[in-house]
Amino acid sequence: DGEGNREPSTLMSWLWPLMTMARERNLVEATGKELKLDLQAMHTGEYPHVKDDGIQKSTIRNYQVALRRFYRYHDFDVGPDDIPLFSVSGSPIDPNDMLTKEEIQQAQEAADNARDRAILDLLLYTGQRREAIRTLRLKDVDIQNGTYRLNPTVEGLKGATDRNGNRPLLGAKGTLQNWLEYHPDTNDPENYLITARPSYAAVDPSSPIAGETIRRVTSEIKKDAGISKPLHPHALRHNFVTIAKRDYELPDDTVKYLIGHAADSKVMETTYSHLSGDDHVARAEEAWGIREPEDTSPLTPDVCNVCNNPVEPGAKACSRCGAVFTPDAHSAKETVEKGIKESYKQTDPEDTETMQEIEAVETALDDPEIMNQLLDNEKVMDKIADKVADRMTDN
């Protein structure tokens, strides 16, 4: 009572553990002691339907949460507090599982068709959940501007659409341009972006692919690329966040917005707590000259997938077409462009000199090479931001 509605995915996360346990135990008649023994057997591997070496405490916690929900709702002999609950300690993510630039490129090369490469790059460069990717419609994506919005009609996105502004496609832009050449029907904007692979059989673009299809695609890519690290959709989500924080130092709220978490979410302090420690040590060693700084960007390709121009290691955007590869570059570019628009609003149209200054800056930023140089120079970007702020204050 008073808890409000729950997403279908959340309900399923409770139902599945209950269904599993109900195969061996009558949950209506079970005692608290019996349930504790069952949970212990899961951990040691003695319980049916689990692997021989057992399951981790973090997984057993899902069963504990489901049981507590069940017994809180039903008035049986077992109370919710009779079920122990393992505490969440540390990050569930192993930093060693994060993909290197070379492994990202291996995975991309292993995707042997345009549809599968589009799926992979959407997961890699947006950090979105599988459900969000498979339900994107053509009208949710602006290829020209390299942005997308989540489909607001979809249930099960865990509130991600509550902050549903434009998000960057980054390196997925060129891949999607290529995929749309093969898409079965781009005339209807209501059609789904990702469809079944075009073949001799008819493809219905008005129906989304199954979540299992996305999992299978990443599994096949992992196998063909010979990558030992996790490559399932949720692992790629963790990969995106880790890179955004570790390599590009994006603010927590920016990262949470990009992946669809609420502003007050604690995900950065829990799931991604592994981003402290070793990463801070590495930066300190670089500052003192003990360690050579990394000059490559994990999300920067060797060749731009929009215009096929060779890209310098560590470049944030293509010097020829202006395609943005890294999340920090997109944020910086968006800040400058927003500042220019605000300057137009705040400036008196009769103030010819100021209008000419703003137009000159806007024209310069249309040059991809100039924009790329600006994005690589943090001091210049800071000065531009300060100038924009001063101009808005003065007006």
Residue ranges and their predicted role:
Residues 282-395:
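C-terminal secondary-structure termini that scaffold catalytic or DNA-interacting sites
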Residues 123-145, 251-254:
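Short, charged phosphate-coordinating catalytic segments
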Residues 66, 70, 144-207, 217-225, ...:
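Basic, alpha-helical nucleic-acid-contacting "clamp/cap" segments
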Residues 101-131:
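Basic, Lys/Arg- and aromatic-enriched nucleic-acid-binding interface segment
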Residues 155, 259-295, 325-327:
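Catalytic-site neighborhood detector that most strongly recognizes the C-terminal catalytic loop/helix
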Residues 1-95:
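N-terminal core-binding DNA-recognition domain of tyrosine recombinases/integrases
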Residues 237-261, 357-360, 370, 380:
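C-terminal catalytic core of tyrosine-transesterase DNA break-rejoin enzymes
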Residues 141-143, 229, 249-271:
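Short, polar N-cap/turn motifs at the start of nucleic acid-interacting alpha helices
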